[in-house]
């Protein structure tokens, strides 16, 4: 679900990049020294999981692990995912350098949302297997939702692409 450079309007790219930069700055300010190794491992997991592709009809899907990263890292997900996205953009050509802030928001914001959902008392009362499924599903769902919304509001010609992406991913 990487957005390449030049796909979005400059205004959308700038606004979402600023939001991502603020979130990243907050994550840097609150991370504890003992959380750094776990953040590094989560970043490596995110990077490596992107290599595992599963054929699905006319397309393919790959693991993103947003729910897992989110429940372990919370707001520090912005740090782990940014490092992995930079490596993916520079080494593999996934996404782009200019759109990295948008891709960070699409990936890290759902991880933080899942973290907060997982902390609720109601969510903790759900059967463990269902809860684990929901952690994975909700991470992918929110990432898809953010991607679709960003495409939809960026350019009118992306409206049908946004609907297609939502249909394939959900």
Where are these regions (language model features)?
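Membrane-interface helix termini and inter-helical loops of multi-pass transporters
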Residues: 1-4, 153-165
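Alpha-helical transmembrane-segment detector that highlights a single hydrophobic TM helix
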Residues: 61-80, 84
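Hydrophobic transmembrane alpha-helices
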Residues: 2-68
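Membrane-water interface at transmembrane helix exits
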Residues: 25-29, 49, 54, 88, ...
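Short helix-perturbing small/polar motifs within transmembrane alpha-helices
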Residues: 103-148
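Interfacial aromatic-anchored transmembrane helix boundaries in multi-pass membrane proteins
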Residues: 51-60, 83-114
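Hydrophobic alpha-helical transmembrane segments
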Residues: 11, 36-41, 78-82, 100-105, ...
């Amino acid at each position: 679900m990487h957005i390449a450079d030049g796909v979005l309007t400059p205004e959308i790219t700038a606004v979402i990049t600023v939001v991502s930069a603020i979130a990243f700055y907050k994550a840097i300010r609150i991370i504890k020294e003992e959380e750094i190794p776990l953040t590094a491992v989560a970043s490596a997991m995110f990077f490596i999981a992107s290599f595992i592709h599963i054929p699905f009809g006319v397309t393919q899907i790959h693991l993103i692990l947003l729910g897992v990263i989110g429940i372990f890292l919370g707001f520090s997900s912005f740090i782990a995912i940014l490092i992995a996205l930079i490596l993916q953009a520079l080494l593999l050509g996934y996404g782009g350098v200019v759109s990295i802030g948008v891709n960070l928001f699409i990936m890290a914001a759902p991880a933080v949302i899942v973290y907060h959902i997982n902390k609720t008392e109601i969510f903790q009362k759900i059967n463990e297997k269902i809860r684990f499924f929901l952690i994975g599903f909700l991470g992918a769902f929110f990432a898809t939702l953010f991607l679709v919304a960003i495409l939809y509001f960026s350019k009118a010609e992306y409206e049908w692409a946004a609907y297609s992406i939502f249909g394939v991913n959900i």
